[in-house]
């Protein structure tokens, strides 16, 4: 559980601000499916 939470949080946590600012539409969907909401 601890590892799964850290992995899920570390992955979408970085591409969120990086891709979220560049491509909110395409980037948001990419990191969203990565492991955040969807």
Swiss-Prot record:
Residues 1-38 are annotated as: Disordered. InterPro entries: Microvir_J-like. Interacts with F protein. GO terms for molecular function: DNA binding. This is DNA-binding protein J. The lineage of its organism: Viruses, Monodnaviria, Sangervirae, Phixviricota, Malgrandaviricetes. GO terms for cellular component: host cell cytoplasm; viral capsid. It comes from the Viruses. It comes from Enterobacteria phage phiX174 (Isolate Sanger). Mediates ssDNA packaging into virion, it locates to the internal surface of the capsid, thereby displacing the internal scaffolding protein B during virion formation. Protein J binds to and is packaged with the viral ssDNA. Additionally, protein J plays a role in viral attachment efficiency to the host cell. Its main location: virion. Belongs to the microviridae J protein family. It is found in: Virion; Host cytoplasm. Keywords: Capsid protein, DNA-binding, Host cytoplasm, Viral genome packaging, Viral release from host cell, Virion.
